[in-house]
């Protein structure tokens, strides 16, 4: 294999590792689940029932394989954006439902079995419990797609800043992030988010990345609607990873500037409020494979309140060491789909970052991570409703 082929293969592997891991993980869980069902609950079932179970498993494997092949062969790029997005989302949703169904079978087996000597009421209760277990996965995904995904709300969060200048006490900052305008989010949802933000009468309006999901999504429409944000000091922002994926970093910056929005790309904007200065800085998306915030420390302004906009929240420990008193981020969608068990929120995002949702502190420094507005991958939210965030600075 020559050098060119090896470079291409390495790039292909790195690009497809997340999807390959997801595909193999789901298929493995399905295979183990089917094997367990055939050996356990369906061991004495009729041949027709066992054949049906195997046929459904094969069909599921075929659908998941077809979706993965379409993706890695890049056939999906030739499909209409809405069909590509919803097709991929549906396959991911089915993967999620199928895994939950396997877990439901396990839970159902753990339930007591109805016996002839049991009362009719007990038999009915156990029957209802089994039905509820199997219906719950589909019901949860349906709720996430059709209800919670569209349940946009205002979230208010106070951020205590040690030694905050009195003229900055009570300063209101409104944040919109992870909009992902496209197949999964209509323009009217962006308009609604802007209307909610404007009702806060904020001093500063922020847009912290991922305006769209893919190349060809309606970026201009998103920018035009975001330009309707109103704030005393103006509209500022930073870019996210999807601006990079879509190749729109420069266009977003230039088109935003024409509309009155300033995207800060390794740059700072000192804002005066009375006798106080808020030094607002922003960085482009910080990649996992490179050191965070290289050279960003030089933007810190002594004597000012230093606030950093970074789409990726993982920069927080570095930002705190550099002297940024407050970091504002997005990227995680709050996990997008998460379940609370024993007062612990479980989500895929937990595997990638400690900073999933809300306010975190490290010494005197703080970071706020917003759940954002849109979705990616699967058009659903569960346990992580979309939000417009209103941040209030306050003295400790």
Regions found by a protein language model. Give the residues of each.
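Soluble catalytic domains of enzymes that build or remodel membrane lipids, polysaccharides, and related
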Residues: 155, 160, 164-396
């Amino acid at each position: 294999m020559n050098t060119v082929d090896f470079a291409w293969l390495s790039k292909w592997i790195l690009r497809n590792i997340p999807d390959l891991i997801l595909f193999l993980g789901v298929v493995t869980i399905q295979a183990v689940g089917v094997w367990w069902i055939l050996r356990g609950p369906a061991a004495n079932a009729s041949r027709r029932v066992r054949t049906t179970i195997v046929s459904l498993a094969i069909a599921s494997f075929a659908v998941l394989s077809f979706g993965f092949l379409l993706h890695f062969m890049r056939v999906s790029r030739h499909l209409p954006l809405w069909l590509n997005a919803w097709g991929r989302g549906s396959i991911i949703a089915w993967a999620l439902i199928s895994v939950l169904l396997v877990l439901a079978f396990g839970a159902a087996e753990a339930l007591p079995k109805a016996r002839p000597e049991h009362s009719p009421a007990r038999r009915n209760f156990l029957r209802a419990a089994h039905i509820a277990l199997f219906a719950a996965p589909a019901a949860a995904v349906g709720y996430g797609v059709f209800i919670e995904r569209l349940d946009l709300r205002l979230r208010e969060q106070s951020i205590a800043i040690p030694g905050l200048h009195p003229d900055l006490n009570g300063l209101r900052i409104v944040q919109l992030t992870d909009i992902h305008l496209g197949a999964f989010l209509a323009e009217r949802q962006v308009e609604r988010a802007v209307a909610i933000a404007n009702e806060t009468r904020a001093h500063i309006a922020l847009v912290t990345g991922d305006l769209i999901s893919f190349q060809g999504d309606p970026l201009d429409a998103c920018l035009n609607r975001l330009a309707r944000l109103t704030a005393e000091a103006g509209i500022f922002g930073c870019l996210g990873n999807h601006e990079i994926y879509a190749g729109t970093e420069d266009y977003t910056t230039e088109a935003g500037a024409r509309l009155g929005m300033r995207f800060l790309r390794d740059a700072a904007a000192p804002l005066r409020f009375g006798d106080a200065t808020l030094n607002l800085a922003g960085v482009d998306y910080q990649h996992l494979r490179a050191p965070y915030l290289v050279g960003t420390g030089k933007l810190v302004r002594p004597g000012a309140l230093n606030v950093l906009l970074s789409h990726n929240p993982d920069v927080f420990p570095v930002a705190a060491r550099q002297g940024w008193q407050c970091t504002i981020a997005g990227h995680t969608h709050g996990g997008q789909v998460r379940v609370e068990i024993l007062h612990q929120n479980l989500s895929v995002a937990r595997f990638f970052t400690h900073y999933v949702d809300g306010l975190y502190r490290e010494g005197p420094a703080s970071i706020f991570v917003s759940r954002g507005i849109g979705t990616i991958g699967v058009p659903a939210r569960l346990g992580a409703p979309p939000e417009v965030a209103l941040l209030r600075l306050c003295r400790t």
